[in-house]
Amino acid sequence: MGVAFDKCDTRPAHIDAILNGLDRYNPETTTVFQDYVVQQCEERTFDCYANLALLKLYQFNPHLLQPETVTNILAKALTVFPSPAFSLCLALLPAHTQPFPTADTDASQTSDFVESIQKLARLSTLLESAQYAQFWSTLNSDDLYADLVADVAGFEELVRIRIAIEVGKAFREINAEVLEQWLDLRSREALEKFVTEVCSWEVDKTGPNGTVVKVPTNKENEARSEVKSERVGVEMFGRVIRRGFEQAA
């Protein structure tokens, strides 16, 4: 069975107490949740349920919203793809942060924040659609992207691991050059170190098509022939046959 959505093994006791009580709706707990987001960024953990609770508080109390905390939550959500975490967080953002500018002054004041959200949403789309090379190209194309993920310790490494997990589900072997682009590892030595030490995969340099990375068989990438047998008895059509005769009569 999967882990329940509202569970997190690394969640501190005081955060758990807030989430399971009425204080989760108390605006005074906003600072506690904000500190917890900082902790997640530093310790490479992710608590989607707690982050959603904070975003809900922002929704009810827009004046308490801290743009940096929101972008950190979204950046952390990128490190757990593929999952609905990013979309859920995005859906809870206050209306004035959405990329639909209005004629009032608030729109100009939040333009930088909205641009940040748009950029993070772009990264999410690329990851969820498995456009990994384009993801890294986009991430490296603008210093603002680097600023948006700067507070998330090990961001690039966490994303690489998630990409590797998805590759392992779909491939038994993959060309090393392609994998270099997907993982944004700029040298063959770095690629070999990552796939052998982090992923426990093998590098084969003897093949006719150049260097390939071999992924061990698992329940996701194993080729299996599926045999389906369907037995349809006459009794299953008894009602249809009877109705046919009844209509004819």
Swiss-Prot record:
Primary location recorded for the protein, binned into one broad class: cytoplasm
A Pfam short name: CSN8_PSD8_EIF3K
Chain ranges of the PCI domain: 46-222
GO cellular component: eukaryotic 43S preinitiation complex; eukaryotic 48S preinitiation complex; eukaryotic translation initiation factor 3 complex
InterPro entries: ARM-type_fold, CSN8_PSD8_EIF3K, eIF3k, PCI_dom, Transl_init_fac_sub12_N_euk, WH-like_DNA-bd_sf, WH_DNA-bd_sf
Keywords: Cytoplasm, Initiation factor, Protein biosynthesis
Gene Ontology biological-process annotations: formation of cytoplasmic translation initiation complex; regulation of translational initiation
Localization of this protein: Cytoplasm
MF annotations from Gene Ontology: ribosome binding; RNA binding; translation initiation factor activity
SUPFAM superfamilies noted in UniProt: ARM repeat (SSF48371), Winged helix' DNA-binding domain (SSF46785)
Cited function: Component of the eukaryotic translation initiation factor 3 (eIF-3) complex, which is involved in protein synthesis of a specialized repertoire of mRNAs and, together with other initiation factors, stimulates binding of mRNA and methionyl-tRNAi to the 40S ribosome. The eIF-3 complex specifically targets and initiates translation of a subset of mRNAs involved in cell proliferation.
Subunit organization: Component of the eukaryotic translation initiation factor 3 (eIF-3) complex.
Family statement: Belongs to the eIF-3 subunit K family.
Protein name: Eukaryotic translation initiation factor 3 subunit K
